[in-house]
Regions:
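Thiamine diphosphate
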Residues: 1-173
Length: 173
């Protein structure tokens, strides 16, 4: 049942980019996502981060791996449906080949007034169970107070040499 206050509120794209820069991120590979459009716009204009658009999530994960092997520090920006579309590639590259892969996952079709578990969108409801099934850790960013989860997710991806998802629960601002 919806409350009168949103469960998830937008997080500043400026703060997200600042966190990424503090972590040394130098490349972002993106499949455009309407939930993260302000983040994408800010990244596109940032001279310190190389921003590229891939055609598919599979391609983005492969580019991420190549950049990492080449000594770069990339992250991905995708939407929730991309998790489902690329699960075999997530298994093969970040999990099996042990490539750190931090994925910002926008919850396309999420109603920020409802908890994820109550969403009418199957894609919104099934992202976390899918990640759990494959052993992919995730953190939520539901409010500006969750911004520290970016650093936690980044460190976990590099400590475990694997994938970690940062689930963006409301459109970035």
């Amino acid at each position: 049942m919806p409350s009168d206050q949103p469960v998830a509120t937008g997080v500043s794209s400026e703060e997200i980019v600042s966190k990424l820069k503090n972590l040394g991120v130098d490349h972002v590979i993106c499949i455009p996502d309407s939930y993260q459009k302000t983040l994408i716009a800010r990244l596109t204009d940032d001279p310190d981060i190389s921003f590229m658009i891939a055609c598919t999530e599979d391609e983005a994960i492969g580019i991420n791996a190549g950049l990492y092997i080449g000594g770069k520090n990339p992250v991905l920006v995708i939407q929730n449906n991309g998790i489902f579309a690329s699960i075999n590639t997530i298994k093969a590259i970040p999990l099996d080949a042990k490539i750190p892969t931090l994925m910002f996952v926008g919850q396309f079709q999420r109603d920020p007034m409802l908890p994820i578990e109550e969403s009418k969108s199957r894609a919104v409801r099934m992202v976390e169970p899918t990640l759990e099934t494959w052993g992919v850790p995730y953190y939520r960013i539901e409010t500006p107070e969750d911004i520290g989860n970016i650093e936690l997710g980044y460190k976990l991806a590099y400590d475990t040499l694997g994938p970690v998802a940062i689930i963006i629960g409301a459109p970035t601002i």
